Curated annotation (Swiss-Prot):
Detected in serum (at protein level). Detected in liver and choroid plexus. Keywords: Hormone, Secreted, Signal, Sulfation, Thyroid hormone, Transport. This is Transthyretin. GO terms for cellular component: clathrin-coated vesicle; extracellular space; protein-containing complex; yolk. The gene is TTR.
Amino acid sequence: MAFHSTLLVFLAGLVFLSEAAPLVSHGSVDSKCPLMVKVLDAVRGSPAANVAVKVFKKAADGTWQDFATGKTTEFGEIHELTTEEQFVEGVYRVEFDTSSYWKGLGLSPFHEYADVVFTANDSGHRHYTIAALLSPFSYSTTAVVSDPQE
């Protein structure tokens, strides 16, 4: 029964994400936003505001270099983390500070942070929406990736 409840919450979150963060076609108002982040609170069923997010890019020597930082808005989103020119082919890591978020709500979480590591723009320039569905003891992530752009 607990599995079914968790699955339903996860699926509801995915439906919410698909409705709340539609892809904007290349060349429109959102064309300068090649990387967007969206965070949802699965416990409260709402966007997760003020979640600190760090983005790192993997260097040739295998180390992680600071790339971008931000905090989610009241809508649980961060736009304009980078520009088209800066967001080149490579391996990136998006780190969500989940511990501070849950502690700010008076909860004691299991994870210190959640991260997503992915390869970007390896088969043409794309736009990425990285979404995270958070709870104090679990998290799930998904990505919406546009078709290659010219």
